[in-house]
């Protein structure tokens, strides 16, 4: 039983794909920005400001540096192994099957939980937008049970519906997905630039003092919750999750060995610049302790402080569009990873069946889309969202370690992009990821271990038995045994009778 059997780079690249290649550098950059910019600006900046103060911009930079180093490693792997599956496929080549399965299992949870979490934030902004037109949904249908303290809620209906609508868009073809995402990202960027231009004049530098009230990492008296730049970076790291989903589009990308690295890096750079500018403006307009009053809608609080009430509607619209693209890219990435795992036999064939009309993994897309919609509708995601962070950081560590390993074991393999500064770059990526993981609470670790344990059960119960690589190795071994047996029989037939009699 070889749990660490590996796929070769050549076999991965040579396999035919029924998916349609239409994505170019611009589309991939828009895909990355669509995944990154959303929840971070419109939701997490409030919680981050309370944790780090005005130094939140440093927290964003720290998280961005971590993602930047990891992004360089992703870019190299994407140019070397341009197939669907992202970190799952890279781990299969570098470390073997069981590691690949566990990373794939981890990413499935990451994408599902992030989409479900974002659907909760989307619902909040959607309800505010409706209220502006005098439309009020029943409170019980505005959020999952237990989401809002002191308010009786049972089901997040808006979030449930939007996830199903996004699933429909994803299922009917990559061209429709590309157009939808490109248009929404351009609108979102225009609204963010408008916000920056209109609010920068209200910044009061006095609000940036003290710049780092909690230092890098500290505990306040009577509290078990860490405060400071590093804990805030662990929180806002959620904002950058999604660029890795770009690499899942390899089999739908034109010249993936060139365009994938560009799409990953361009989207990270653009998003980081916007995040830092936004956080400096927001903490410059509103003193950081004041974000406690509107922690779930920090941008709305900033607009209130400026008196630019007309901007509220525009920003609400931008938030809705921003979070819609995040969900779209997460659900897209999830379906492509499941497709890759199914194609390798580690998941049932159902998930890998490509619709002949739409050229998409239609059934798998709808299966996980419905599960994600149900999770977003019924489950209080607040207690689980840090699982997204630890899952993503684990994938980053595996990919970064994989680049180190492949540079050592296959130095001459073709790479359309080579990460600069190896081995320093992947080592720094691993170190930064470990630092951010250290900022997460122990409950997150427990849940993560439980999910991994479930993954091991699924692998040994199904994946190991149905692995196509395992079946191929078994057939090759049987054929080799047959050849050896045939050779032995031939030798015996040609031997003297006395020798044959003696050996038998």
At which residue positions do the language-model features occur?
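C-terminal membrane-solvent junction of multi-pass transporters and transport-like membrane proteins
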Residues: 151-155, 350-362, 396-444, 465-473
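Membrane-helix boundary/coupling elements in multi-pass transport proteins
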Residues: 42, 83, 106-124, 235, ...
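Helix-loop-helix junctions that connect adjacent transmembrane segments
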Residues: 14-19, 56-57, 134-159, 183-316
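Membrane-interface "cap" regions at the ends of multi-pass membrane proteins
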Residues: 1-45, 50-54, 61, 68-72, ...
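Hydrophobic alpha-helical segments of multi-pass membrane transport proteins
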Residues: 128, 191-195, 330, 338, ...
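Membrane-interface loop-to-helix entry segments
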Residues: 123, 154-208, 264-268, 385-398, ...
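Extracellular loop-to-transmembrane helix junctions
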Residues: 20, 41-148, 227, 267-270, ...
């Amino acid at each position: 039983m070889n749990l660490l059997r590996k796929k070769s780079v050549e076999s991965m690249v040579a396999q035919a794909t029924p998916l349609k290649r239409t994505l170019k550098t611009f589309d991939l950059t828009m895909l990355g920005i669509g995944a990154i910019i959303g929840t971070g600006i419109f939701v997490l900046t409030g919680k981050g400001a309370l944790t780090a103060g005005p130094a939140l911009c440093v927290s964003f930079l720290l998280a961005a540096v971590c993602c930047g180093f990891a992004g360089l490693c992703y870019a190299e792997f994407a140019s070397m192994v341009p197939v669907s599956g992202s970190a799952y496929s890279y781990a299969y080549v570098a470390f073997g099957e069981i590691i690949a399965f566990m990373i794939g299992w981890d990413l499935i949870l990451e994408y599902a939980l992030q989409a479900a979490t974002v659907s909760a934030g989307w619902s909040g902004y959607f309800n505010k937008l409706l209220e502006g037109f005098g439309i009020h949904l029943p409170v019980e249908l505005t959020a999952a049970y237990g989401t809002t303290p002191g308010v009786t809620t049972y089901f997040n209906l808006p979030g449930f519906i939007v996830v199903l609508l996004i699933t429909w868009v994803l299922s009917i073809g990559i061209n429709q997905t590309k157009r939808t995402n490109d248009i929404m990202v351009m609108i979102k960027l225009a609204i963010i630039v408008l916000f920056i231009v209109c609010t920068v004049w209200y910044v009061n530098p006095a609000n940036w003092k003290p710049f780092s009230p909690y230092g890098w990492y500290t505990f306040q008296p009577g509290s078990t919750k860490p405060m400071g730049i590093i804990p805030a970076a662990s929180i806002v790291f959620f904002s950058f999750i999604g660029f890795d989903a770009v690499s899942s589009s390899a089999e739908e990308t034109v010249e993936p060995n060139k365009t994938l690295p560009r799409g990953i890096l361009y989207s990270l750079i653009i998003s980081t610049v916007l995040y830092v500018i936004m956080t400096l403006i927001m903490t410059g307009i509103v003193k950081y302790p004041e974000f406690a009053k509107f922690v779930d809608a920090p941008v709305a609080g900033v607009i209130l402080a400026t008196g630019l009430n007309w901007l509220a509607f525009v920003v609400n619209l931008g938030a809705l569009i921003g979070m819609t693209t995040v969900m779209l890219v997460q659900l897209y990435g999830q379906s492509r990873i499941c497709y890759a795992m199914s194609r390798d036999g580690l998941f049932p064939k159902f998930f890998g069946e490509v619709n002949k009309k739409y050229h998409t993994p239609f059934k798998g897309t709808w299966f996980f889309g419905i599960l994600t919609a149900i999770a977003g509708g019924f489950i209080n995601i607040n207690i689980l969202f840090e699982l997204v962070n630890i899952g993503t950081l684990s994938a980053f560590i595996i990919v970064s370690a994989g680049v180190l390993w492949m540079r050592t074991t296959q130095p001459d393999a073709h790479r359309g992009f080579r990460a600069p500064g190896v081995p320093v770059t992947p080592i720094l990526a691993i170190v930064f990821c470990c630092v951010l993981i250290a900022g997460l609470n122990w409950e997150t670790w427990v849940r993560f271990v439980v999910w991994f344990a479930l993954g091991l059960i699924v692998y040994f119960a199904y994946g190991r038995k149905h692995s196509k690589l395992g079946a191929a190795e078994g057939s090759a071994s049987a054929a080799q045994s047959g050849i050896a047996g045939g050779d032995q029989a031939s030798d015996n037939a040609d031997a003297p009778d006395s020798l044959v009699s003696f050996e038998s």
